[in-house]
Amino acid sequence: MISINERAQESASLIKLYVMGAVMQEIQNGNLEMNDTTKHLLDEMITVSDNSATNELVRYLNKDHDHKKGMKKVNAFIKAQGFEYTHEYNGLEDTSLWYDADTKNTTSAKDCGRLLERIYRGEFISHLASRQMEELLLNQQVTYKIPSTIPSESRVANKTGETSDCENDAAIVYTPKGDYILCIMSCEVSSKSSAVDSLQEMSSLIYSYFMNRDTSKVSRQVEATAKETD
């Protein structure tokens, strides 16, 4: 994993990746049921980034339907999973759920990348949960950032995040020549359109690298390394 300028940044809707994980953990533990309502809320939270659905799922994490207590469960899950730069301080959009209005929810590109890698490998919560989360991300409707420059021959499973001065995206990209994970966060930007342009350009360059790289050379390097470690 390559990480550049690793630090906590405003998560915007990337925090929903961790809410999704916390909900799936509670389902795995038998404390929540994967019923039609839960499925609908998860779908709304991930595929169209609905804030009300997110707040409701956080409430579901507490037996009394208390959002603040549910949020503590999200943060306990985040800590237990080892995501160093991620924390949910406030609910989304609804100001009555802002408990620390001067502090923004945070994550990092590396934390998001590690989460997506574990989903990709089938190791996040469980293999079944990983596949369910991957399917939600593959059905993403907000695709104007990383996916926008990816040809139709490849698939993208992504989750975006945006505020008045943030443009974030975290994605698994599946290509004919190898899959990769790309997470880009740009916050405190003066021009959102320029930030999106830069994000799209980076996505295009990285995709081109993966499609045009000398895979035979990579294979030879892997084989040589394997022999050295025998």
Question: Model segments located where?
Answer:
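Short, well-structured active-site flanking segments
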Residues: 25-43, 126-130
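Extracellular/periplasmic catalytic domains that process cell-envelope and extracellular macromolecules
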Residues: 34, 106, 150, 163-165, ...
